[in-house]
């Protein structure tokens, strides 16, 4: 299951006139295969999500949840439909759409020999954020990893690694964050802690 978080890191609660920060109209994705025929991963999906809203996408494996995220992330090309993210049209402004989205993947894939601070600095660099404009320490505090900022990623607990993935998704201050099955494979206590961090956002 995928949890969709719509946020403004600085002042989400100050926006009284909420607008649709994510708008999906008749989104369709068909995977063509000459041997097995066409697979309709998404069929005329319509969705509007407002700023500040927490929204969940629920469904079994193969329901198209990951395909939906990958289309917005730019790694899968849609067959038809309109996608608007933070006011940017996916067809006309794909780079701006990608910059408006942060994704917390299900799989924990972190370089074990880099510290959380180093990983966030590298991530910021990928988005072209100048050093003077980076908010690395703020993000580390937001996910309660400031004390582990200079530790090797391999030394972090499972919960800390999950929070570090969340920090990576937030480092470029996107207005939309996707969490792909954030509680998969974790115990009850860790699950509660993860949701606590989500609510704090």
Where are these regions (language model features)?
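Conserved ABC transporter NBD signature motif
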Residues: 81-89, 97
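Catalytic Walker B motif of ABC-type/P-loop ATPase nucleotide-binding domains
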Residues: 177-180
């Amino acid at each position: 299951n995928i949890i969709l978080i719509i946020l403004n890191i600085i002042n989400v609660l100050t926006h009284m006139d909420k607008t649709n920060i994510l708008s999906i109209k008749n989104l369709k994705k068909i995977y063509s295969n000459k041997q097995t025929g066409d697979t309709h991963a998404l069929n005329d999906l319509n969705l509007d999500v407002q700023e500040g809203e927490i929204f969940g996408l629920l469904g079994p494996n193969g329901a198209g949840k990951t395909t939906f995220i990958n289309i917005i992330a730019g790694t899968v090309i849609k067959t038809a439909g309109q996608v608007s993210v933070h006011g940017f049209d996916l067809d006309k402004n794909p780079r701006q759409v990608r910059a408006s989205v942060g994704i917390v993947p299900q799989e924990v894939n972190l370089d074990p020999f880099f510290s959380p601070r180093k990983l966030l600095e590298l991530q910021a660099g990928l988005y072209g954020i100048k050093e003077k404009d980076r908010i690395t320490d703020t993000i580390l505090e937001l996910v309660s990893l400031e004390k582990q900022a200079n530790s090797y990623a391999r030394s972090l607990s499972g919960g800390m690694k999950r929070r570090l993935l969340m920090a990576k998704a937030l480092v470029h201050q996107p207005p939309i964050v996707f969490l792909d099955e954030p509680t998969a494979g974790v115990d009850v206590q860790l699950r509660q802690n993860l949701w606590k961090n989500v609510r704090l956002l």
